[in-house]
Amino acid sequence: MENRERLGSRLGFIMLSAGCAIGCGNVWKFPWMCGQNGGGSFMLIYVICLIVLGLPTMIMEFSVGRAAQTSPLYMYRKLSGGRGKWNLWGIVCLIGNIALIAFYAVVSGWILYYFVKFLTGQNQDFGFEKMITTPSVNVTYLLVTLLIAFVILSFHLQGGLERITKYMMSALIVLMLVLAVHSFTLPGAGEGLSFYLIPHFSKITGSVVVGAMNQAFFTLSVGMGGMAIFGSYVGKDRSLMGESIHIIILDTLVAVIAGIIIFPACFTYDVEVTAGPSLLFDTMATVFNNMAGGRWWGTLFFLFMVFAAMSTVLGVCENILAMVRELTGWSRPAGCVACGVGCFLLALTTALGFSVFHFQPFAAGTTWLDFWDFLVSNNIMPIGSILLAVFCCYKVGWGWNKFLEEANAGKGLKVQPWMKPVFKYFVPAAVLFIYVYGMVNFAWK
């Protein structure tokens, strides 16, 4: 395989990393989790988790990736000098990214389907339940989603992924601001924003904390190499703490603005904010269908969602592609064909899981989507974050001094020595406690 590719600019690195973080986790999963967990209460815990858990983990991921100059498949083995069994977690990172795309690409296909329906004026002729139980719709839009992603990735890094992501992220921010301004004009804006932004401390429970932590890791794509791959594409001219803060701020702003767009509309048209995964589909489609000029507002809304979803699909597929190419030595085009076919076949489990390939992994009503989401969000990401902290802070792995040197190389904000207890003790202990609490609660459901 050719020498390692590089991103063309600092802006490209920030936009690409933010694009991977900003996706369905912000515009699909965050609003309905917020609605089901008390609105402002969930928001408060979520922001705390981003700062005290997500930020240190992101800095560690970028550092490991930049130091190793390899994909997550080999970075642990390379930096540990072959000690221990760290190479096994590289394999888990590959499995985790494939499992993520197995349901993420399907959800992205749903968003693309809704965009096409609104754009073509067919927004009255479909529904969420009808869509997910129609095999031809799910399979077709899954195929289109992955085809778009791997065609873009088949070009070299700067001319394909970096350039497209810059355009998509810029368009996404503009669309979100237009939609947010419109939401402020709705009659239910005050009530919706009050529910969304004002915390009610009586609603903060253990389940809310677990959900907020899992959502923080899910949206930042940390714990299984989602950020490390982009760290491997940049030089050492900027320190990684400042870059991580910029990315988290962008990610959080998109999540917050998504709620500002959605909750005023829900309260204006008296729709249920606890609708769950269908909130962004049936609920918002109903809102737009009853709104003056709703077809065009709906088109803009789902176009912004397409950009958000595709930015993450591209990031995850790039990670899978990089690992497979390092494993096989294939060129970008050849790797794209193989990875595209493999991801499509695995994602068929989710696409057909609501109809002809029905599977209930946990309880009545659960599907393949729940299985893949549980595997990635509730297990691989938090466990990966614990192992990453151990790897970066203890001699059994890479070690604190080497991590600190890498994280602080270049201009910008530095990780301070007094922060060591946060990285070494607080992050792994807090994540482990919340993870075990969540597993116990899950087992007793």
Where on the chain are the PLM-derived regions?
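Transmembrane helix-boundary motif of multi-pass solute transporters/channels
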Residues: 11-49, 226-231, 241-245, 249-252, ...
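Helix-loop-helix connectors at the membrane interface of multi-pass transporters/channels
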Residues: 74, 108-133, 234-237, 242, ...
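Membrane-interface "cap" regions at the ends of multi-pass membrane proteins
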Residues: 1-29, 57-62, 66-88, 235-239, ...
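Membrane-embedded translocation segments of transport machinery
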Residues: 2-3, 7, 162, 166-310, ...
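C-terminal membrane-solvent junction of multi-pass transporters and transport-like membrane proteins
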Residues: 88-97, 328-342, 371-431
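Select transmembrane alpha-helical segments in multipass membrane proteins
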Residues: 6-17, 42-45, 84-98, 142-145, ...
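Inter-helical loop and helix-membrane interface segments of multi-pass membrane transporters/permeases
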Residues: 3-5, 32-37, 67-92, 105-160, ...
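Loop-to-transmembrane helix boundary motifs in multi-pass membrane proteins
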Residues: 6, 12-14, 20, 136-140, ...
